From Swiss-Prot:
The active site is at H173, K601. InterPro entries: PEP_COase, PEP_COase_bac/pln-type, PEP_COase_Lys_AS, PEPCASE_His_AS, Pyrv/PenolPyrv_kinase-like_dom. This isozyme is from salt-induced (CAM) plants. This is Phosphoenolpyruvate carboxylase 1. The lineage of its organism: Eukaryota, Viridiplantae, Streptophyta, Embryophyta, Tracheophyta. PROSITE patterns: PEPCASE_1, PEPCASE_2. It catalyses: oxaloacetate + phosphate = phosphoenolpyruvate + hydrogencarbonate. The modification Phosphoserine is found at S11. Induction: By salt stress. Signal peptide: none annotated.
């Protein structure tokens, strides 16, 4: 082997140290973790595909690392020549390798973050990134601040805490680009790495863990990263529910127990009541039909039954353990009477149980009670299973649990009895954990929200009024619609019969509401109306629920998304609250959802964020005026462009009183894995939401000064105008966007069940927010996040020199503005206009090149002004740890970007000529044919062999590297 080859074997480790030459702190082992995982992977790569492939990967990395140091565009061209010279099989192997290395880098980072938090608290203000936003002692730190700094009493804190609610809503937004098969393997790699660096590890343990690590890395690399079929809504629901089984189910009682301990440490001897609604879970998976024709009424029914079956099964799997624990004979008379009554009717053996299958003696009264609970859980599970399989069940409803109170009553009886007999420590063990699970998850595991677009309800109403011969509802004014809807809601007559003419769309809406009427009411949460614009949107759904005989109507939640709809939201809610019928219907409680994604796409991030801040304030005023308790439902995505950002700071930056102890927020796509993929992540997530909601309520942020508001209003007007002048008013912008990004190829990733557009044809307006953000994220340009900000800053700074100091004051003293600017800074740190320029050079026609040049100049100007406002010389100078992490992963992402840009060129331009060098892994092809076999995984591709898979792998890799998709 040549000296050059020998040198290359250690080159990536050396490059890592050059990119991040010094440790950020004494506990920093990130480079060590990174180097170990890469070393193991490169050995595996050589064993599977040969030494030449390994050297090629290392050479590409070196070139990319050199580009990161110099930012010389020629280096990108050299990288391009290298990747285009690879044949189909080798191209897939290389793209797969870099994507895999980025996933390994993420895992190294997660282990380092977990270790860092155990060793040392993160310094105050280090919050740009979710992982460094707060320490593991969030709850204790929050309680300390409230008591020491704000002089709140422990009892006041306890009363506030036990009455607050955080509802986390899992959605199937198609942003999770990593397959579940790989996520599980990644979890095992993470565990192996963490254990390898444990202090008390023996040499034998170390050897076995190293072998296990290599095994899992190889298994992950050998797994096809690409979903070959599009997931169904049922697939998405099962994937989402797997987190409950793996982390959330046991994570909730663990978190609540830690909360008890934190409260005890401040002098509260009472435990958080088991039925305090601190944490709740909801889901849109199988209920969100907005723009997704695959979510049918049958899907909704199946998803609800599956969730009930899963819940009963998880309770059932724990009940034996509880029966083992509650073996005591001493009990209250109340419990003994119940046990004796049950004992009379339970003479038979139960051979289908493993434990306690014979009749339980009356001297074990708690077990007698729990055996009856177990029987009902068994039948509850089996009835759901049968209904799911064949739509009928031989098991009578009476043998099952149908109401949560039926389930809790015998458990409460056991708890009361244990406490009365001096066994409170036993009662506060597994029984309390179990009761907390029942109170949190109920019989349905999660409550399913239904989401439908307002236009679909208008279609139904139009069909009804036309059928009744009273005109076209669609043509009526808003006032006439409201008058008619209210007259029907106040009346008793049926509105339509089976003879109502129905299109498929109308049948879908009505059949969905019929499913709501058919299934147990505790299966459902809210009925969310997307693209809501007026009070009639809400009243129409209320009327449809009544017509379909929904016994316990779902609360109706308008979702205001576009800028104009957000501005009109307070007036809409004022009108609704003024209606006596509606006021009586809501019983003093109203939920309103605001959408971060579509508002950002409509007006740009800055304008949308400020408008949502103001609309929350206005909605709060309206609610207070009418004596209504308002709950804001935040439709946040994972990326900054879709409202993402560190949880704690995002909550604390909301206007004062708008949370008020009640918060709903979506947990979307890849954010589910980042929040609940591991036990410690689950614990951290529950802690952050609870702590931030408590702190916001007890220490509300100060309202911005009038002059700050005026300045932000000016900035929003300018930012919106600049954003729309390009995105919506430039006649050829859509053409440029589709050429300069992989937007048209997005659907090939098969990462979600819904189409990327609400309507098959149309421009940016009909494009969903996720592919819009996804496409710009892939090219590292992040246009939707920053476009308009530079123009806004320029306008106010040039208008009045004093605005410079005012902006600096806002940055230091206004949490909303601080978080907005810091998140923009983080996005710029992840961006690279030279990469975007490469896409333009290769993919954009000559007459449209000026678009990119103009936008890149705007990008640089915006970045400069942003740093000026923040008082920073360099990006992320206040967060060296995040800066280090981004620098370490940039060379991988850059290689994938170059590979992606050239692959898109080859796909879109059949005349693009490349010179392939001979197959790199020739020496082992005869034995394994590994690279060639990868090409065969996609036999039906419409493109030249290997191109489509290479493209998809680069998209997945870039998403993993930036830790954002859409």
């Amino acid at each position: 082997m040549s000296t050059v080859k020998l040198d290359r074997l250690t080159s990536i480790d050396a490059q890592l140290r050059l990119l991040a030459p010094k440790k950020v702190s004494e506990d920093d082992k990130l480079i060590e973790y990174d180097a170990l995982l890469l070393d193991r992977f490169l050995d595996i790569l050589q064993n599977l595909h040969g030494e030449d492939i390994k050297e090629t990967v290392q050479e590409l990395y070196e070139q990319s690392a050199e580009y990161e140091r110099t930012h010389d565009p020629k280096k990108l061209e050299e990288l391009g020549s290298m990747v285009t010279s690879l044949d189909a099989g080798d191209s897939i192997v290389v793209a797969k390798s870099f994507s895999h290395m980025l996933n390994l880098a993420n895992l190294a980072e997660e282990v380092q973050i977990s270790r860092r938090k155990r060793v040392k608290k993160v310094k105050k203000g280090d919050f740009m990134d979710e992982n460094t936003a707060m320490t593991e002692s969030d709850m204790e730190e929050t309680l300390r601040r409230l008591i020491v700094d704000l002089k709140k009493s422990p009892q006041e804190i306890f009363e506030t805490l036990k009455n607050q609610t955080v509802d986390l809503v899992f959605t199937a937004h198609p942003t999770q680009s990593v397959r579940r098969s790989l996520l599980q393997k990644h979890g095992r790699i993470r565990d192996c790495l963490a254990q390898l660096y444990a202090k008390d590890i023996t040499p034998d343990d170390k050897q076995e863990l190293d072998e296990a690590l290599q095994r899992e890395i190889q298994a992950a690399f050998r797994t096809d990263e690409i979903r070959r079929t599009q997931p169904t809504p049922q697939d998405e629901m099962r994937a989402g529910m797997s987190y409950f089984h793996e982390t959330i189910w046991n994570g909730v009682p663990k978190f609540l127990r830690r909360l008890d301990t934190a409260l005890k440490n401040i002098g509260i001897t009472e435990r958080v009541p088991y039925n305090a609604p601190l944490i709740q879970f909801s889901s849109w998976m199988g209920g969100d039909r907005d723009g997704n024709p695959r979510v049918t009424p049958e899907v909704t029914r199946d998803v609800c039954l599956l969730a009930r079956m899963m819940a009963a099964n998880m309770y059932f799997s724990q009940i034996d353990e509880l029966m083992f624990e509650l073996s005591m004979w001493r009990c209250t008379d109340e419990l003994r009477e119940r046990a004796e009554e049950l004992h009379k009717y339970s003479k038979r053996d139960s051979k289908h149980y493993i434990e306690f299958w014979k009749q339980i003696p009356s001297s074990e009264p708690y077990r007698v009670i729990l055996a009856d609970v177990r029987d009902k859980l068994y039948y509850t599970r089996e009835r759901s299973r049968q209904l799911l399989a064949s739509e009928v069940s031989e098991i009578p409803v009476e043998a099952t649990f149908t109401e949560i109170d039926q389930f809790l009553e015998p458990l409460e009886l056991c708890y009361r009895s244990l406490c009365a007999c001096g066994d409170r420590p036993v009662a506060d063990g597994s029984l309390l954990d179990f009761m907390r699970q029942v109170a949190t998850f109920g019989l349905c595991l999660v409550k399913l929200d239904i989401r439908q677009e307002s236009e679909r309800h208008t279609d139904v109403m139009d069909a009804i009024t036309t059928h009744l011969g009273i005109g076209s509802y669609r043509d009526w004014t808003e006032e006439k619609r409201q008058d008619w809807l209210l007259s029907e809601l106040r009346g008793k007559r049926p509105l339509f019969g089976p003879d109502l003419p129905r299109t498929d769309e109308i049948a879908d809406v009505l059949d969905t509401i019929n499913v709501i009427a058919e299934l147990p009411s505790d299966s459902f949460g809210a009925y969310v109306i997307s693209m809501a614009t007026a009070p009639s949107d809400v009243l129409a759904v209320e009327l449809l629920q009544r017509e379909c005989k929904v016994k316990k109507p779902l609360r109706v939640v308008p979702l205001f998304e576009k800028l104009a709809d957000l501005e009109a939201a307070p007036a809409s809610m004022t009108r609704l609250f003024s209606v006596d019928w509606y006021k009586n219907r809501i019983d003093g409680k109203q939920e309103v959802m605001i959408g971060y994604s579509d508002s950002g796409k409509d007006a740009g991030r800055l304008s949308a964020a400020w408008q949502m801040y103001k609309v929350q304030e206005e909605l709060l005023k309206v609610s207070k005026k009418f004596g209504v308790k308002l709950t804001m439902f935040h439709g946040r995505g994972g990326t900054v462009g879709r409202g993402g950002g560190p949880t704690h700071l995002a909550i604390l930056a909301q206007p004062a009183e708008t949370i008020g102890g009640s918060l709903r927020v979506t947990i979307q796509g890849e954010v589910i894995e980042q929040s609940f993929g591991e036990q410690h992540l689950c614990f951290r997530t529950l802690q952050r939401y609870t702590a931030a909601t408590l702190e916001h309520g007890m220490n509300p942020p100060k309202s911005p000064k009038p002059e700050w508001r005026a300045l932000l209003d000016q900035m929003a007007v300018v930012a919106t105008e600049e954003y729309r002048s390009i995105v919506f008013k430039e006649p050829r912008f859509v053409e440029y966007f589709r050429l300069a990004t992989p937007e048209t190829e997005y659907g090939r990733m098969n990462i979600g069940s819904r189409p990327s557009k609400r309507k098959p044809s149309g421009g940016i307006e009909s494009l969903r927010a996720i592919p819009w953000i996804f496409a710009w994220t892939q090219t590292r340009f992040h246009l939707p996040v920053w476009l308009g900000v530079g123009g806004a800053l320029k306008h106010v700074l040039e208008k009045d020199i004093r605005n410079h100091n005012m902006l600096r004051d806002m940055y230091n003293n206004f949490p909303f503005f601080r978080v907005t600017i810091d998140l923009l800074e983080m996005v710029f740190a992840k961006g690279d206009p030279e990469i975007a320029a490469l896409y333009d050079k290769l993919l954009v026609s000559e007459e449209l090149q000026s678009f990119g040049e103009r936008l890149r100049a705007n990008y640089e100007d915006t970045k400069r002004r942003l740093l000026e406002v923040a008082g920073h010389k360099d990006l992320l100078e206040g967060d060296p740890y995040l800066k280090q992490r981004l620098r370490l992963r940039d060379p991988y992402i850059t290689t994938l970007n170059v590979c992606q840009a050239y692959t898109l060129k080859r796909i879109r331009d059949p005349d693009f000529k490349v010179t392939e060098r001979p197959h790199l892994s020739k020496e082992i092809m005869d034995a394994h044919k590994a690279a060639a076999e990868l090409v065969k995984l996609n036999p039906t591709s419409e493109y030249a062999p290997g191109l489509e898979d290479t493209l998809i792998l680069t998209m997945k890799g870039v998403a993993a590297g930036l830790q954002n998709t859409g």
